[in-house]
Amino acid sequence: MATFEKGKVFNENAVIDYAEGGVVSKELIHNDSGSVTLFSFDSGQGLSEHFAPYDALIQVIDGEMELTVEDTKHVIKAGEAFIIPSGARHSVNAAQRFKMMITMIRG
C-alpha cells in the first residue's frame, strides 16, 4: 500500500488496499470544514441504509458500485461520480469489489 503526504502527488487508488471479505477506510483529510475518505469494499460487502447530514460526493476509482438512493439503484463505474443530497436515505452494495473516494463538506 502506498502512502501520501500533503503537498505531494499520490495515486489515490494505490493508497488503499482491498481486504478479503471486508471494508477498509482511510481518511485523507478531516477538519472543521469536512472530510475526504477512501473506501475499499470486497465483493459481497456493503453499507446498510443510512443518512448523511451533508451533501456527499462519491467518486469511484476502481471497479463499480451499486448505490441505492431513496429507493433508486445507480451503478457507478470507475471514473464516474455521484452527489448524494444531504438527508437522502442511501445504501451501498458491492456486487464486485470497488474503491471509492467520498468528499463531505459541512455547510
Question: What name fits each language-model region?
Answer:
Residues 1-33, 68:
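A short, N-terminal "cap"/entry segment at the start of jelly-roll beta-barrel domains
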Residues 22, 37-52:
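Conserved short histidine dyad/triad with adjacent acidic residue
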Residues 35, 64-66, 73, 89, ...:
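Structural motif
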Residues 40-42, 52-67:
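Short, conserved beta-strand element in jelly-roll/cupin
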Residues 61-62, 77-78, 96:
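A cytosolic small-molecule/anion-sensing beta-strand core signal
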Residues 71-86:
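Short acidic-glycine-tyrosine-enriched beta hairpin
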Residues 86-107:
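Ligand-binding loop in jelly-roll beta-barrel domains
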